[in-house]
Amino acid sequence: MKELKRDLLTTKYTKVLVEENYQFNAPHRYEVVTNEPGCYPDTLAKIHFQEGPIKECGVNGVCNEDLINMVIDRLEHFQQSEFACRENAIAITKLEEALLWLRKRTIAREQRGVEGTHSV
């Protein structure tokens, strides 16, 4: 595992680790660990994404949409509290937009008869 580096990813409290060796064009395993100076990192979460097409490999991990929906749910709960804010509302909208584009991709693959397979 190596540390994930992204422009907007903060490492103030946690670090995200990503597998280095993977198949099917993208990493499948991620970990979120504590990032406290002088302390050994504790694993807070392990995420295992789907490895390979479902029709060929079966369901063996979470999909992108699962995690996006979790974040939307969490932000919607904040929006029902004293922590409601414009930034959360915009983030929800953008995450919902991401779900729309991912759904559009799936629909297009279904129409071509290749959804759930390794075919393009």
PLM regions with names:
Residues 4, 17-19, 59, 101-120:
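Signature of extracytoplasmic/envelope-associated structural regions
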Residues 28-78:
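A short, structured beta-strand/loop element
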Residues 21-23, 38-40, 86, 91-92:
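Residue-level signal for the start and early helices of compact helical domains
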Residues 73, 78-113:
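Short, compact, well-ordered microdomains
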Residues 2-5, 12-15, 46, 55, ...:
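Context-gated lysine
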